Amino acid sequence: MSGRPDTPAVALADRSSDAIPVPEPLSEMLPHKGLARGTVTRLSGVNSVLIAVIATVTQNGGQVGIVGLPRLGLLSAAQMGADLSRIATVPSPGTDPVEVAAVLLDGMDLVVLGTRGVDVAPSRSRVVMGRARKQSSALLVVGGTWPGAQTTIDTEVLTYRHLPAGDDLREARSGFGRIGGMRLRITVSGRSQRAETSEADLLVPGPGPVRPVTLVRAGQARPQLAVAN
């Protein structure tokens, strides 16, 4: 962090939209095409979507703080192309993870908070949201509730997929081989928009040259990527 609490540590590549970049399948559904600065978003469901968000933010020059999520895999983030030097983690924040997250809002573009079952009072949530607005940062609450959250993102797995038959797996058949990804259903709702649902594919590369795990709009996957039986 910069040591200047009133200024984000690192400016993103494009601050003109006042939104923090997210993967394309999400950006198409969000009002600001990203996570609006100064807001709180609640995310539930598939961890891979959270990891994809973290990867996208750091790829675009942003700083991310992660609080209260000791099992969140940074290896998975690296496989999605995250810049690990731009991630600060507090896996065990003690009895008050909300306070730790509030402090990190001073120096991070995005703070990811696992509430660990803590109920946040509306009065306190307003204070934290005010801090996010002042610092032009964003808070992403994972697996819990947050009174007054502007946006809610719910995700679920629809199908798993095996690695595609091709140059790397010439003998692959439907229902065999390592999992090569999954199809997800993503629902975005908020105080300023009706619920909108879309589908996305998480693609895991097979043997061969190292390629990142990617989250793309449904239908951009290679046609060989068949649903496993």
Name these PLM-found stretches.
Residues 41, 65, 88-90, 140, ...:
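Hydrophobic/aromatic beta-strand patches that form the interior of the parallel beta-sheet core
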Residues 162, 193-229:
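C-terminal regions of RecA-like/P-loop NTPase motor modules
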